[in-house]
Amino acid sequence: MVLIRVLANLLILQLSYAQKSSELVVGGDECNINEHRFLVLVYTDGIQCGGTLINKEWMLTAAHCDGKKMKLQFGLHSKNVPNKDKQTRVPKKKYFFPCSKNFTKWDKDIMLIRLNHPVNNSTHIAPLSLPSKPPSQDTVCNIMGWGTISPTKEIYPDVPHCANINIVDHAVCRAFYPGLLEKSKTLCAGILEGGKDTCQGVSGGPLICNGQIQGIVSVGGDPCAEPRVPALYTKVFDHLDWIKSIIAGNTAATCPL
């Protein structure tokens, strides 16, 4: 059964379609404390998600991570022993991809957030670059987050875990996710042999390829990390014009999901 990776049935009911709990990183190791300066820990209505800082005032996450009360934490590694330069923000404004009957639910799983106050670059905080071009098949990419590290149990680590996965032929995902269009605004990524994947607690986090954010954690198999069941990531490159337009102040073409 396909579920968007979130932690609560409440959000599943709110979105009105089957989704998987917020993802974790299965099969990974603790991230180096200096390799995730852009990574955001998102708490929203009791749900844990991830996000990505793209400049001092803006960040990206998944639309299905939206909630009434969102707390955004920057510069975090250990949740129990926070870095001294950790900063906390809340959304000033949230933007969703424009409504369109030409796109599936997966194509629209992106949220652009303007922070209530800009964050300051520091030892553990810095933005990640937007993509200059889309990744090609077989590109090795990185996933990361504080999500559960077990495909069958909710075991949440104190520190973020990282793993490498590959961009997979989109036909593999179309075979597993009914209704996924050939020209979908998504990326298919994973390890076809299984063993490495995002899972509960990492929805909205980044798929990083060649030092750029290429994807946003969206949908995956249940349980996680199964063979021949790669995950779907919202394709950031296909939303670039919209992202840049919003940041530039053109908000006319948006509507809530």
Swiss-Prot record:
Provide this UniProt record's keywords sorted from A to Z.
Disulfide bond, Glycoprotein, Hemostasis impairing toxin, Hydrolase, Protease, Secreted, Serine protease, Signal, Toxin, Zymogen
Q: Which SUPFAM superfamilies match?
A: Trypsin-like serine proteases (SSF50494)
Signal peptide limits: 1-18
> Catalytic positions?
64 (charge relay system), 109 (charge relay system), 203 (charge relay system)
The UniProt entry, under Pfam families, shows: Trypsin
Give residue ranges for domain Peptidase S1: 25-248
Subcellular location, record wording? Secreted
> A cellular component term (GO) from this record?
extracellular region
User: Where is carbohydrate linked to this protein?
Assistant: 102, 120-121
SMART domains (alphabetical): Tryp_SPc
Ranges that cross the membrane: none
Q: Which GO terms describe its biological process?
A: proteolysis
Top-level EC class: hydrolase
Q: Does the keyword Hydrolase apply?
A: yes
Can you give the propeptide residue ranges?
Answer: 19-24
Q: Which GO terms describe its molecular function?
A: serine-type endopeptidase activity; toxin activity
**What Enzyme Commission number(s) appear in the record?**
3.4.21.-
Q: List the disulfide bonds.
A: 31-162, 49-65, 141-209, 173-188, 199-224
Q: State the tissue distribution.
A: Expressed by the venom gland.
In which family does this protein belong, per the annotation?
A: Belongs to the peptidase S1 family. Snake venom subfamily.
Q: Which function does this protein serve?
A: Snake venom serine protease that may act in the hemostasis system of the prey.
Provide the assembly information. Answer: Monomer.
Q: Please report the name of this protein according to its UniProt entry.
A: Snake venom serine protease KN10
Specify the taxonomic lineage. Eukaryota, Metazoa, Chordata, Craniata, Vertebrata
